[in-house]
Amino acid sequence: MKPTYQDALAYFGVSGAHPGGLTLTKFLLEQEKITEETTILDGGCGTGQTAAYIKKNYPCSVTGIDYHPTMVKRANKRFEKEHISIQLVQGSLEKMPFPSDSFDIILVESVLIFTNCKNSLAEIKRVLKPGGVLLLVEMTAERALYAMEHQNMCEVYGIEKVYTEKEWINLMKEAGFPKVEVTLGHSVFSHMMTGMEPEDEAIDTSVPVNMQLEGKLMDHSYILYTYGNIIGYRVYRASL
């Protein structure tokens, strides 16, 4: 089985592997009302960077879930090192081991596109409490892609589709979210001009050299610089 882009992120321990990184995450959280009663799920928590930040800066309950076993190990290691207690589950957004109506806020950063989006959104809606909020940061096509453009991106990331803003909104509405807002968004190139530099994107240099996985990260860079004017990201806020 060929290694995936996600395998590369896990192997090298890349944190904040989404546009804007932790800087953007902090901004999004500041817009929400978070109290001691708030329950937050970091969906696709990766190395645990976001979950750890929330736990250390807000008085709420935090849970993390990630499908990749290496990411779960890295997240646990982070939580132990930083002496914080966070419930962490290895599992898929498509079928989460949580009761219905469990969370007030679910934060998903550049993860949903790697799953069956319809199944994941249905599960997210199930585990959100009435009045709950989904904060979604996702790769978004600036226009309908040509066949070759779409194929190249899907092959690099191992995904089935790159959605436009309208398609993302339709997916969320079809999943039962009556209100979907786009609160922020840029193409890759226009984002570079904002000065919103991501925090802590350093890779784990202690792991052995793996040229195949390094190649996956290089493929990612190629996509960004080749198609940076036609792909980007959007922040979607979907509420129940």
Predicted regions and their residues:
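A short acidic, Gly/Pro-enriched loop at the edge of an enzyme's catalytic core
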Residues: 94-105
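A short glycine-rich, Lys/Arg-flanked "PGG" loop and its adjoining helix->strand segment in the class I
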Residues: 118-133
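Short alpha-helix
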Residues: 160-176
